[in-house]
Amino acid sequence: PALTASVPTGGMLLFGAVREAPERRADDPALLNSVLVLDEKGAVVADYDKRRLVPFGEFTPFKRVLRVTKMTVGDIDYVPGESSAPIQLVGLPAARVLICYEAIFPRSGDDEAGWILNVTNDAWFGMSAGPHQHFASAQLRAVEEGLPLVRVANTGITAIIDPYGRVIVKTDLNKDAVIDGGLPVALVEPTWFGKHGNSTFLVVTLLLIGVSRISLMFPDE
């Protein structure tokens, strides 16, 4: 009821949540790190489950072999979500969701997203360089795709970033603040990276190898 009351008329509330993974045995429970979208009636109209999990933070790799526990509270591991599809929001372009450190990875797969939503908990970084590095990674995702990015961080840095990576507005670390701003428009044409993805790096690598071989064949006298 409290969450529903905070949804504006005709609007939506997007928030992070931990929920139980479905279809698990009673003796093998697991959790999902999720973003849920609530409408004014209190119904969940869209969701996304984090796909890239933090090793030793959200799950323990090779758990039976290493016999170590997570660095975070709780014994139950998280499991990755199954879909990377953008979430559909009434009155807005489809949104690609990146939860926490998913923002440090380039996109994988094609979709029809019109903007990027990055929801993160950076509190554990404290007043270090971590939040600033994490924020810079999110900026890079906007530039790669030519898409605006809205970043929501519980302790900052929360921001709206345009498709060129320029910061429209942002908050400071550990400061109470509210951002009220419009969503920048995505680039008309997809970027090279948006079209070709990680194959870009293969092309650049081959070009560099070719230039190096030519330089060896025709050294300067």
What is each model feature region?
Residues 1-221:
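Enzyme catalytic cores with a strong preference for nitrogen-chemistry domains
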